[in-house]
């Protein structure tokens, strides 16, 4: 799977994230792709002209093994075009909040996080969402739920790596189309059968996408794409 970002300049944004994460940028049929792996979520950047409407519903958490590494990551990101971002964090909090060149928020987490230990550089995709949607995505992806407490949930590949987490209530009001979305690729089996499976789990079919696949919404109303392999 990959996380898709709408971008005014997909190549520029992919180049930024490729250098921050140490990944090669590939030209995908839909945009610029930073391929993932069995343990790291991929990132896909596509052309989109939608301006941000309200608070961001997803953001990335990058991990650090030492304070020096955290400082190097922050310095490198700033040099590549990131900017400090004030989201109300307190001065004594250890993580650093930045915005990428197109304003997408991300955090560079301080060392010592037990929750993100062993998760790799892209440690977490933090999402706004309910407990139910966390369980939906666990079943949809075939990933176990590794955190389920106080309405917060997280899932993780059986191979480990990046966690996808949902913060529970109160939820941020939705406004327009999400600029970050999940992109799933069907590598085997029938597209129609997979759509029926996801619908049985709680997804809603939104539309067909010519030469690509279909767009659905999860139980919280977040759009995602199921593409033919």
For every predicted segment, state its role.
Residues 1-29, 34-86, 99-150, 155-207, ...:
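Glyoxalase I/VOC metalloenzyme domain signal
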Residues 91-93, 209-211:
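Short, small/polar residue-rich loop motifs at catalytic or cofactor-binding pockets
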